[in-house]
């Protein structure tokens, strides 16, 4: 009887470990979009995005002069130019309850207007945090990125910027959103 109890306990533990490992691997690779059947995007497709956010960064200068000047010792973290296609999402709702798409557009717009993080959900389910790139202008509220994200909420668009990956966290810093003065 004791052996059978131990075997059952070992089998249950193995199942839990496989489940946790599988979920962790899926999260790391971005293997799927949560609840894809719940609501589709408001505009655009992965083959034909409805718009474009940000200006293209270059390998020679992935960061703006403002960001370089604001960084520690004038050396920002490594970044590389990227153009990625995906749906603009409100990260807080997507990561908490899986909501995205046209049915969530109004809620997502309110969340982002009130300071929740903006994300890009790609076709393979990868998630990127989207942040305005110009450091001081972002800090001082002198960019239009958040407004653009609200306008394009639930749209599939192309986002241009600089990719930064730190400890598995992926962010695209979107350049060219400073307000005209």
Q: Locations of the language-model features?
A:
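OB-fold and OB-like single-stranded nucleic-acid-recognition modules
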Residues: 26-181
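Bacterial N-terminal signal peptides
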Residues: 11-24
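Low-complexity, intrinsically disordered/propeptide-like segments
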Residues: 5, 20-22, 28
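N-terminal secretory signal peptides that target proteins for export/translocation
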Residues: 1-9
